[in-house]
């Protein structure tokens, strides 16, 4: 069985530094579980790790696809599983680091996101419905059939909303029901999972998020978005709907002021962190690490290593 170490948590909590220190001490390589860092050219807005910050530790699933290309949880699962096997077969420890809970779940739960047959006509109908009546309307259709997905997914995540509705139409079951009916096989995975969630005081986390946004602006987020536009990437693409990118696009189009854009990026990032924490709390296998209780990152790293070895 393959040992798999997972370091997750909300945006700006400090997953990158902890995961690198762990990789250094445990002879590991890092697989990014971040739905924005998979895109090329989108470096500043995704807070993508730099080559210097990697400190020589190999990183996987960063800069995987072009911003216009389709990439979903199934794509991630396929690439991540290949990377895990490759890292393990070379005698190293695969470490998953990131904040996209759905990506992480695709590895630690044994369910197939593509089990139900597809209904292209229904997908096209829902997409057209979103164009005519808005994403919020299509999202509202989930409420009566799958309240959990309704709460979990947000309206602009149209692809996943459509998928949830499609599964219900084909199977007569919500995705939530489908998963519950298959709970016995859910944990039948080829990994020995050690799953840690980093967290900290909410006020401190929000301060870090606000500061990170200011740093992004200082590094040239506006110029990055301008460059992406000049390369032909448009607001309707999934990648360009990411927090930071959509707000700057609004600013560049003259819809809002720069101050408003910065405010919205900070607010959107804080709300995203809140949603991430809600997601991670649902997994009973995860061990929470309160960073406020430790005097240094080294102490946190040593604590995680001890818990892994004592398991």
Swiss-Prot record:
Family affiliation: Belongs to the IPP transferase family.
Assembly, per entry: Monomer.
Cofactor: Mg(2+)
Protein residues bound to substrate: 11-16
Gene3D superfamilies per the UniProt record, alphabetical: 1.10.20.140, P-loop containing nucleotide triphosphate hydrolases (3.40.50.300)
GO MF assignments: ATP binding; tRNA dimethylallyltransferase activity
Taxonomic placement: Bacteria, Bacillati, Bacillota, Clostridia, Eubacteriales
Swiss-Prot/TrEMBL keywords: ATP-binding, Magnesium, Nucleotide-binding, Transferase, tRNA processing
Site feature location: Interaction with substrate tRNA: 100, 123
Keyword Transferase assigned: yes
Pfam families: IPPT
SUPFAM superfamilies assigned: P-loop containing nucleoside triphosphate hydrolases (SSF52540)
Binding site for ATP: 9-16
Function in brief: Catalyzes the transfer of a dimethylallyl group onto the adenine at position 37 in tRNAs that read codons beginning with uridine, leading to the formation of N6-(dimethylallyl)adenosine (i(6)A).
Residue numbers spanned by region Interaction with substrate tRNA: 34-37
GO biological process: one example: tRNA modification
Record protein name field: tRNA dimethylallyltransferase
Domain of life the protein comes from: Bacteria
Enzyme's top EC category: transferase
EC numbers: 2.5.1.75
Catalytic activity as recorded in UniProt: adenosine(37) in tRNA + dimethylallyl diphosphate = N(6)-dimethylallyladenosine(37) in tRNA + diphosphate
């Amino acid at each position: 069985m393959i040992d798999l170490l997972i370091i997750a948590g909300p945006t700006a909590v400090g997953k990158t530094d902890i995961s690198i220190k762990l990789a250094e001490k445990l002879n590991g390589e890092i697989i990014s579980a971040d739905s924005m860092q998979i895109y090329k050219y989108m470096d500043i807005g995704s807070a993508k790790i730099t080559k210097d910050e990697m400190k020589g530790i190999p990183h996987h699933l960063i800069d995987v696809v072009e911003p216009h290309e389709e990439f979903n949880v199934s794509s991630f699962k396929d690439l991540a599983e290949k990377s895990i096997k490759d890292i393990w077969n070379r005698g190293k420890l695969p470490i998953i680091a990131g904040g996209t809970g759905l990506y992480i779940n695709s590895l630690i739960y044994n369910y197939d996101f593509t089990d139900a047959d597809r209904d292209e006509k229904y997908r096209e109908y829902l997409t057209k419905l979103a164009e005519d009546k808005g994403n919020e309307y299509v999202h509202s259709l989930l409420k009566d059939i799958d309240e959990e997905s309704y709460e979990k997914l947000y309206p602009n995540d149209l692809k996943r909303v459509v998928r949830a509705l499609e599964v219900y139409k084909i199977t007569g079951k919500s995705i939530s029901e489908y998963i519950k009916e298959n709970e016995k096989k859910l944990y039948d995975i080829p990994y020995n999972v050690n799953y840690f969630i980093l967290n900290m005081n909410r006020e401190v986390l929000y301060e870090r998020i606000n500061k990170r946004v200011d740093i992004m602006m200082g590094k040239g987020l506006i110029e990055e978005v301008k460059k992406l536009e000049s390369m032909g990437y448009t607001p309707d693409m999934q990648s360009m709907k990411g927090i930071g990118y959509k707000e700057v696009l609004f600013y560049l189009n003259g819809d809002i002021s720069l101050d408003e854009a910065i405010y919205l990026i900070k607010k959107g990032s804080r709300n995203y962190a809140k949603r991430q924490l809600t997601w991670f709390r649902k997994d009973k296998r995860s061990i929470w690490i309160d960073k406020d209780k430790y005097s240094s990152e080294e102490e946190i790293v040593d604590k995680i290593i001890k818990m892994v070895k004592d398991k």
